[in-house]
């Protein structure tokens, strides 16, 4: 696969209703700590949850990051600023109305040349291994895939998009938040190339031109995964057997993350 520019996209425009009321965006909740230099001395300081994602993107070597924000999310801009502290240029795109993650991702399209490779993760999640994006990118390039999903085990399939693979790591099944299922892998992070980006844009364009846009249901990334499978795109899954994935979207999950990273 021809090497292209690798960028990161962080969708952070959601309202975080499950943790409301809270005076800060959920992406800015403190989980764990970081070591910083203060007057020549190393000191511990709180670490916000979205910083784990930014650092994982940095490990993968992305050249720039786009963070899509919405109303009430300007604390994110104030915290990360231009990305200088992380060695990566960070730009922000404003989404006035949260319509679903795919729409947030598609807002980045006008700012791209159309040949980039994208790494994407959710800023209210923490996952291991730390180099998961780096390994996902390597697999994506080796497989010459259109979309490659990073997969993690879970005992709570009803909270995630669940993925089935064949022996060649091809994605052959996707079910969103099933109450019961034989599937054991959730998709947590993603890597894609130009063909998938074009497909997502065309799917959203088609939905917007009809009055039956999911009959009021929010369009989710899983809808685009399904569209890619139906279109015959090369969709792969990379399982992280020893990894873990925490979505801090509820109080219990936030408590688990705080205890794990204290």
Which functions belong to the PLM regions below?
Residues 2-76:
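N-terminal glycine-rich phosphate-binding loop and ensuing alpha1 helix
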Residues 76-78, 84-167:
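Conserved beta-loop-beta/alpha segment of the NTase-like Rossmann-fold superfamily
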